[in-house]
Amino acid sequence: MRFEGERVVLAFGALEDPTQVDELEFLLERPIEAEIAPAGRVAELLKRHRGGEVLLEQASEGLRLQFVDDDEEDVDLKTLPAESPIVRLVDSLVLGAIDRRASDIHVETKDREVVAKYRIDGVLYPAIEPLDKRHNETIISRLKVMSELDIAEKRVPQDGRFRLRVKGRTIDFRVSIMPSVHGEDAVIRVLDKEQLNEAFRRLRLDVLGFTESDLVKLRKYITEPYGMVVVTGPTGSGKTTTLYAGLSEIATPEDKIITIEDPVEYQIPGIVQVPVNEKKGLTFARGLRSILRHDPDKIMVGEVRDPETAQIAVQSALTGHLVFTTVHANNVFDVIGRFIHMGVEPYNFVSALNCVMAQRLVRVLCEHCKRPDTNTQDLLRESGLDPELYQDQVFHEPVGCEECGGSGFLGRTAVAEMLDMSD
């Protein structure tokens, strides 16, 4: 809804009864201009506008978080009264993140308000309407209690975690609290391990979105007896998922596969997974040295961060092991520069390397509501493509529906480039 002079412009998902406009004009005592908008988008805006109120209403209907400890035993938190509106709001934010497939929950303190957002398919969406800034301390305190952090400490960052049992499955949450100019901010990573572990049992490379040619090459190199397979990309681009998919395809009782990760987020049957613990001195380099004494056939190093790890990984690949790893770089060619910068001899690295894959994740249009888009000529030209070559191609555009939460997108797929060392 917006005002244009004396007129009120209203968006309707569907206008089945035109007399509704007349009734509204009578009530508002102003002329109304009706516009038709996607029904999913209208529903999403209404839900967001009443977000805080709706969440509180839902939470008040006997909905409470069930906390469990590392041994799956129930935990009773001594915290704010159970009927506190802030407790119900935070609890509902957490449950809403699970229902909407969010990977992260952001609580940001602004100059005059507190904003809550969900990261869904890599994009931040408002979770509820902004709240008054006076609620900031209570919300952050609730999160600190949930994750067993120091409520009194507000000047330094704090990290914690908590675990819930929701709909019969256990879900982990990693909490990071950070002080800012206007107050404390929080980010909560949602790790639905049980659901994802089940998905990883069925995970294969051919469901990740790679082209057929890249898929054939990648499968060739992950079945080599030795060498190094490197996946690169920014944080959250699916590098670990790609490596897990590759390991799942080649895991057999005849091979011993050991991984070292920081942290071990998802468990794969038949594979020994070692978590990094830098506080106790277990770094990637030290863990990798220990792994080599356990007679592995294949090794996965979660990330190459330092020269020592890079050197050991390359030497392992040169001495008869198949090594999987990731490194942060912008593209496949930058990976070579990163390893050389970390002190690896160029000849050794190139000799050890089987292939490098750089990847990104892009959102996929929702299959339930996407519609054909005929106005694509300008976009094709801007992309450097000849529209004449795509005359018979049907393009689609996002719409928004209940299934995708009004965004028009549902899920993500990988886009990759490969450096094949045999070319």
Where are these regions (language model features)?
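Short glycine/Trp-rich loop-beta-loop segment that forms part of the substrate-binding cleft
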Residues: 9-55, 208-215
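Short, flexible helix-loop junctions that flank or precede catalytic/ligand sites
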Residues: 83-96, 100-423
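Ordered, soluble secondary-structure elements with a strong preference for glycine-centered loop motifs
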Residues: 11-18, 22, 32-36, 80-87, ...
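Long, low-complexity, intrinsically disordered polar/charged segments
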Residues: 1-8, 68-70, 75, 292-297, ...
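Short, compositionally biased low-complexity segments
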Residues: 16, 20-21, 59-68, 114-117
